[in-house]
């Protein structure tokens, strides 16, 4: 029996960037803390309704390795919102639409959000929401193994836009994969160039927080 997916009218797509260390220097049980949040409310066809982005202060220092990878400095993070304020801002953005479904590229963002909220004694602003693992679902649609976002864009013949490993840029690239993924579940060839070239354009509207 073919699986039938019913898409919500809108989905909140989120990407988180975390503090990080080189593997050789990383202590045991190290947990990268959230330092940047990117989010967008989108339709299944890839229309971006609203966008949100903020830097977040963290207890962990921003290492040189982290700055090289993310392009985020300690000064950037020091100028960000306190974690509780960032969660409040995300909660307010999340309630702008009636859907209670959010997605990310993989499960790491879900785990990171829950971990950091628990660390600060806060309830996740997305507690009780359905989480969509877009990385897993996108790979399933094409009957391939799960890959990173950048590799998925290459497979889908979609150009990477904006700096990789910046939260909002990654969100907008995930939106393209999200919009391109679902027709493949309905018997479209997994490498149909006409479909990929005819993907919906991203419509950027104002209205999200900074």
Regions found by a protein language model. Name each.
Residues 2-4, 9, 30-37, 41-70, ...:
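Metal-dependent phosphoesterase core characteristic of DEDDh/y 3'-5' exonuclease domains
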Residues 1-16, 21:
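N-terminal accessory regions of nucleic-acid-interacting proteins
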Residues 21-23, 139:
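Conserved protein kinase catalytic core
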Residues 68-88:
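Metal-dependent phosphoesterase signature
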Residues 24-28:
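Short, P/G- and charge-enriched loop/turn segments at secondary-structure junctions
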């Amino acid at each position: 029996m073919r699986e039938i997916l019913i898409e919500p009218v809108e989905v909140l797509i989120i990407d988180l960037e975390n503090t990080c260390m080189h593997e050789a220097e990383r202590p045991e049980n190290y947990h990268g803390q959230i330092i940047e949040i990117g989010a967008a409310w989108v339709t299944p066809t890839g229309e971006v309704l609203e966008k949100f982005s903020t830097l977040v202060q963290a207890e962990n220092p921003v290492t040189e390795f982290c700055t090289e990878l993310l392009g985020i400095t300690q000064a950037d993070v020091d100028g960000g919102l306190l974690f509780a304020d960032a969660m409040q801002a995300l909660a307010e953005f999340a309630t702008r639409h009636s859907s209670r479904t959010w997605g990310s590229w993989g499960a790491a963002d879900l785990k990171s959000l829950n971990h950091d909220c628990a660390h600060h004694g806060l309830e996740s602003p997305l507690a009780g929401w359905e989480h969509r693992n877009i990385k897993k679902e996108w790979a399933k649609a094409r009957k391939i193994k799960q890959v990173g976002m950048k590799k998925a864009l290459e497979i889908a013949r979609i150009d990477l836009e904006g700096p990789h490993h910046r939260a909002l840029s990654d969100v907008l690239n995930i939106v393209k994969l999200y919009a391109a993924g679902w027709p493949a579940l309905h018997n479209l060839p997994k490498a149909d160039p006409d479909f990929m070239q005819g993907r919906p354009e991203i419509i950027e509207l104002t209205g999200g927080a900074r």
